[in-house]
């Protein structure tokens, strides 16, 4: 019998662990199914197709053209006004044309710009990854925290109900006054209001979780206050990592490179272009005189658009200004990166210190509440109903503060990774 009970509890434990959902599993779910992230992945595919379109400019084009017409002359007169003989024809024309651009100073720059565009799309995808994964962490930790606070408030309501019943009994015995019972009733009403508020917050956070991550069974979520990956151990290392990985900086660098290519493309509009074409055509029932004709045409074309009313020079000036703008944005991104990493590091340190303080606060509040409640119930001490209410309130606030501070500490760790540029699927091992 003892072995049977042991086996049952082991099976129950294994089943519980198997069905539990960790933050890693939630992040994988968000990574694979989030709509915003999937939309950004399509943007990468668009950039890849743009490169293929630009690459086609280097290849020859082939065109086949066929036309067929039918003539039906209703009346034909000669110069003297008499009727002339009518000889209608039904011409058929078929041609195939091969054309190759030989010189185009802009297509090389355009091709390089599209290659940069793929790198840019990848960086934007990684940035969107960070945003969605951080939202998922917020949703995951937020749902757990609101569930904890709902449970804390539920237990507080039960405690207030028990206290009110005790005070009513003590009132009948003459141990407390009617005002003490009124205080307990007021305290219960306040506890019920907070409980209702916590229930509403839980529902809101559950909806947010389902929107960002997907469906969830709240009872399967495992709480964690430590990041699932290593975080930098110093501010200096965090800053150095951000210089390599920060996506905003990388995006600004790539957009600057694209602006430089736009200048080259604009200048190429003032340069000559050259193309070569070969066309073979076949005509049947060509005219009343000739029946068939087959000919080949080899054609070389050189074009030099040297004047367009100042439009092309204005385009060059415009792109020069865009380049200056992108340079300024890059400088600003570098400065913001330093500020964000430093702020994230400071927030992590302060949230950890605050968490330790709140833990000590909860422990002290529990000891104080236990002692005050025991004195009050014994009737031997000088503790009043108000003392118990205040003690319960301090403990409640400390417990809720602990739930919030544990979540804030977890978010601070991931926010540091986000500011560095490491809150990605590859670093978190989501693939």
Language model region names:
Residues 19-67, 73, 217-257, 305-306, ...:
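Bacterial Sec-pathway N-terminal export signals of envelope proteins
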Residues 38, 61-84, 88, 100-127, ...:
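Small/polar (Gly/Ser/Thr/Ala-rich) solvent-exposed segments
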Residues 92-98, 238, 296-302:
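Hydrophobic, lipid-facing positions within transmembrane beta-strands of outer-membrane proteins
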Residues 2, 25, 131-243, 255, ...:
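Periplasmic alpha-helical coiled-coil/stalk elements that build and connect Gram-negative outer-membrane
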Residues 39-54, 128, 132-152, 162, ...:
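Amphipathic alpha-helical coiled-coil segments
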Residues 14, 411-431:
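Gram-negative outer-membrane assembly/targeting C-terminal domains
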Residues 115, 178-187, 317, 385-393:
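Short, charged, amphipathic alpha-helical segments
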Residues 7-14:
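Bacterial N-terminal signal peptides
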């Amino acid at each position: 019998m003892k072995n049977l009970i042991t086996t049952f509890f082991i099976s129950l434990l294994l089943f519980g662990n198997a069905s539990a959902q960790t933050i890693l599993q939630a992040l994988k779910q968000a990574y694979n199914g989030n709509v915003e992230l999937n939309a950004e992945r399509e943007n990468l595919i668009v950039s890849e197709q743009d490169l293929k379109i630009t690459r086609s400019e280097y290849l020859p084009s082939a065109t086949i053209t066929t036309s067929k017409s039918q003539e039906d002359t209703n009346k034909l007169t000669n110069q003297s006004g008499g009727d002339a003989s009518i000889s209608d024809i039904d011409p058929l024309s078929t041609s195939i044309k091969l054309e190759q651009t030989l010189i185009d100073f802009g297509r090389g720059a355009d091709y390089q710009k599209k290659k940069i565009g793929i790198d840019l799309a990848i960086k934007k995808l990684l940035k969107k990854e960070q945003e969605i994964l951080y939202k998922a962490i917020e949703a995951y930790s937020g749902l757990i925290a609101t569930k904890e606070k709902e449970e804390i408030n539920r237990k507080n309501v039960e405690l207030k109900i028990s206290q009110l019943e005790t005070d009513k009994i003590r009132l009948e015995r003459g141990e407390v006054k009617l005002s003490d019972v009124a205080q307990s009733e007021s305290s219960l009403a306040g506890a019920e209001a907070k409980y209702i508020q916590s229930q509403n917050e839980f529902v809101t956070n559950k909806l947010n979780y389902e929107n960002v991550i997907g469906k969830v069974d709240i009872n399967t979520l495992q709480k964690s206050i430590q990041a699932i990956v290593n975080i930098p151990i110093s501010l200096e290392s965090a800053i150095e990592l951000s210089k390599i990985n920060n996506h905003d900086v990388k995006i600004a660098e790539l957009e600057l490179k694209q602006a430089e290519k736009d200048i080259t493309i604009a200048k190429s509009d003032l340069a000559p272009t050259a193309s070569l074409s070969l066309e073979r055509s076949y005509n049947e029932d060509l005219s009343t005189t000739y029946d068939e004709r087959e000919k080949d045409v080899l054609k070389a074309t050189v074009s030099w658009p040297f004047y367009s009313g100042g439009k092309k020079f204005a385009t060059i000036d415009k792109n020069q200004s865009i380049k200056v703008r992108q340079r300024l944005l890059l400088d600003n991104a570098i400065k913001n990166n330093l500020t964000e990493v430093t702020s994230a590091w400071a927030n992590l340190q302060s949230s950890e210190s605050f968490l330790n303080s709140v833990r000590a606060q909860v422990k002290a509040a529990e000891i104080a509440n236990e002692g005050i409640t025991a004195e009050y119930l014994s009737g031997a001490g000088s503790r009043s109903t108000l003392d118990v209410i205040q003690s319960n309130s301090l403990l409640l606030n400390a417990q809720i503060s602990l739930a919030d501070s544990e979540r804030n500490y977890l978010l601070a760790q991931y926010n540091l990774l986000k500011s560095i540029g490491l809150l990605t699927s590859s670093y978190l091992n989501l693939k």
